[in-house]
Amino acid sequence: MKFTTKIKEYREKVGMKQFELAELVNVRREIIVCLENGKYNPSLKLTMDIAKVFDIQVEELFSFIDENVE
């Protein structure tokens, strides 16, 4: 299974820049870049902070892809 986030999707949906989201959740922009590219797994606190910004449930930020399905 591959773990992916929908952070970029939600961010772009509201017209927010990476640096703006980073400021709202108190991290560097590079962290947002890594999250969106699947190179960093967020802490529970960061996940909750991001979900709060978009007014969504934490579960809505993630999806799982089964890489073994043909």
Q: Where are the regions a protein language model picked out?
A:
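A short, Lys/Arg-rich alpha-helix, primarily the initiator
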Residues: M1-K13
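Alpha-helical residues within the helix-turn-helix
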Residues: E12, E23, K52
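Short alpha-helical DNA-recognition segment
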Residues: M16-V33
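Short, basic-rich loop-to-helix N-cap that marks the start of a DNA-contacting helix
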Residues: K39-D49, E67
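Short, charged recognition helix plus adjacent turn
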Residues: K52, E60-E70
